[in-house]
Amino acid sequence: MPAATRALGASILICLSAASLPAAPPELLISAATNLRNACERLETEFEVSTGIPVLFNFGSTGKLAAQIEQGAPVDLLVAADAATPRHLESLGLTLPGSLTTYARGRLALWWRAGSSLDFGSLEELARPEVKRFAIADPRLAPYGLAAVQALQAAGIWEQVQPRMVYAENVLQALQYAETGNVEAALVARSLCVEGQGRWVLIPAGWHEPLDQALVLISGGPRTREAQRFAAFLLGAEGQRILQSFGYETPGAVP
């Protein structure tokens, strides 16, 4: 075979091999719990302006996001609604050692539509007979759903209201059920209430386990350096200020 032909064949082989390799995604891919949906819009804007790094968020319940990571999803960073799930991924060897950090503490709230004929002054009022249905996030997948169950039990109305509960896949879907009138109210994250059009009442923090929320870098993620920069931004002064504006308590403010 002529040398020129061999060289051309080698070039084609190299090109085909390169084409078969999976390309790194152009954006930093962050899996984030849905309670962060509103806050992340502002976080994304500020981070991209300050760093020039594009971000793509994948929202879902913390349990579902963790399952995706366990199945090999090319995620760079998990920003969870609890600390237990990141610790679980850490125990499986799926995270960057030493990267698990608490970034905020969330609060649970009862939300209902502003135009509703119903009004709530406390969680116990969900037991009133005129409340036909209300929504919570699936407690098997969503930390805010588990907190809702704990709060209903602490309020002494669990047995009474359990038949009226509608389970949503995540806390954002629970809110959407209430917004669209499919249910009269929903137990959701305060962070989803503060800029909305509805009405809401805060649930006593002592009625459920603390909603300490942690982040962790995923080992083998295609954009680890960029993920480290986002984590530093979220834990820094500007990121913490944004979280506080959405009703989160930040580590320095948590007693």
Task: Tell what function each PLM region has.
Residues 9-19:
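Bacterial N-terminal signal peptides
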Residues 1-9:
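Bacterial N-terminal signal peptides that target proteins for export
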Residues 23-52, 56-73, 80-83, 87-96, ...:
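Exported/periplasmic ABC-transporter solute-binding proteins
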